[in-house]
Amino acid sequence: MPRKAREYPEEGEFVVATVKNIHPYGAFLILDEYPGKEGFMHISEVAPTWVKNIRDYVKEGQKVVVKVIRVDPEKGHIDLSLKRVNQQQRKAKLQEYKRAQKAENLLKMAAEKIGKDFETAWREVWVPLEEEYGEVYAAFEDAAQNGIEVLKGLIPDEWLDALKPIIEAYVEIPTVTIDAEFEITVPKPNGIEIIKEALIRARDRANEEKDIDVKFTYQGAPRYRIDITAPDYYKAEEVLESIAEEILRVIKEAGGEATLIRKEKRIRKIKRR
């Protein structure tokens, strides 16, 4: 089970917890990411409406996402709230938790590979990477995209060698795909050839960049669709802007007209091989 490097959660943090026992006035929950730590959720923090029976909302053994509203390390008190977590926050926290589970499994594979127990792995790898990146899986994504060398100096070199093939095989990198359309006309006998040449040159130049993929699709005159896949939205936008400037320049010089029509971005994942 993934655990945080910190001993206590911070106020305002969303955590995954397991309902331990329920009382008429509230419930005690085990904080899954903080070993040995429990929190209390008063009945007034269960739902935004009046709660007659707390068991209508939570069950013993149930896993829930709750918000930490107060922490007193000296007394060991942690107050929790379920009603202050909306659906979007719950979804985001569960996604983060799943990423932590995957990172933990990959680290266990690396530990087994070099004959170390997970406590050592947690101390030598998990803690420094979480402190640097906020979450360990984000560190693994960075290594998958930019090379294991980005982790050098953060963790011992023996872990770099053990993690490299594991990250390459199992870590998925989020990529952003944006699409748009160009309306292009060149009123000349060889207008189609001029348009094709402009699109091909723009595409090939963009595809020379690392982790960039550009595709054009003919949609029927005068429309041409462009799909750009990049590591992040800002890079995709940068590439689109560069391509648009190139196409508009070439078409204008040829005596034609070109217009860019924007569409929405899409997010998908690719697996490093």
From Swiss-Prot:
Intrachain S-S bonds: none
Residue ranges of domain S1 motif in the record: 12-83
Stored InterPro entries: NA-bd_OB-fold (IPR012340), S1_domain (IPR003029), S1_IF2_alpha (IPR044126), TIF2_asu_arc (IPR022964), TIF2_asu_C (IPR024055), TIF2_asu_middle_sf (IPR024054), TIF_2_asu (IPR011488)
Record keywords: Initiation factor, Protein biosynthesis, RNA-binding
Superkingdom of the source species: Archaea
SMART domains linked: S1 (SM00316)
One family name in Pfam for this protein: S1
Cited PROSITE patterns: S1
UniProt GO MF annotations: ribosome binding; RNA binding; translation initiation factor activity
HAMAP family the record matches: eIF_2_alpha
Function: eIF-2 functions in the early steps of protein synthesis by forming a ternary complex with GTP and initiator tRNA.
PANTHER family: EUKARYOTIC TRANSLATION INITIATION FACTOR 2 SUBUNIT 1
NCBIfam families attached to this UniProt entry: PRK03987.1-1, PRK03987.1-4, PRK03987.1-6
Family from the record: Belongs to the eIF-2-alpha family.
Subunit structure: Heterotrimer composed of an alpha, a beta and a gamma chain.
Record's protein name: Translation initiation factor 2 subunit alpha
Organism: Thermococcus gammatolerans (strain DSM 15229 / JCM 11827 / EJ3)
Gene: eif2a
